[in-house]
Swiss-Prot record:
Disulfide bonds join 37-73, 53-69, 56-82. It comes from Penaeus vannamei. GO terms for biological process: circadian rhythm; neuropeptide signaling pathway. It is found in: Secreted. Belongs to the arthropod CHH/MIH/GIH/VIH hormone family. Residues 1-30 form the signal peptide. Residues 1-16 have a biased composition (Low complexity). This is Molt-inhibiting hormone-like.
Length: 102
């Protein structure tokens, strides 16, 4: 913080206060997902599984629905109910969820 404050008050000509912090500020893309998901990171797979939970939330409009649906990396009773309620192929989505977990 001191480095940031001193750089903004000095006449060093830094283009941005963030430049003073250094360049190592990468964000791990996997951090946007549940850390219980131990399988191979597959953005498309997670998008499909997450979409089931978001659609289920939109049907029931209860905040806990989306959270419960995503718990344990989509391997839970709520996810199964959501898949069935949305009239998706249950066995297909269960295989997808299990592959995200292992």
């Amino acid at each position: 913080l001191e480095k940031l404050l001193s750089s903004s008050s000095s006449s060093s000509g830094s283009s941005s206060p963030l430049d003073a912090l250094g360049g190592d500020h990468s964000v791990n893309k996997r951090d946007t997902f549940d850390h219980s998901c131990k399988g191979i990171y597959d953005r498309e797979l997670f998008r499909k599984l997450d979409r089931v939970c978001e659609d289920c939330y939109n049907v029931f409009r209860e905040p806990k629905v989306a959270t419960e649906c995503k718990s344990n990396c989509f391997v839970n009773k709520r996810f199964n109910v959501c898949v069935a309620d949305l009239r998706h192929d249950v066995s297909r989505f269960l295989k997808m969820a299990n592959s995200a977990l292992s």
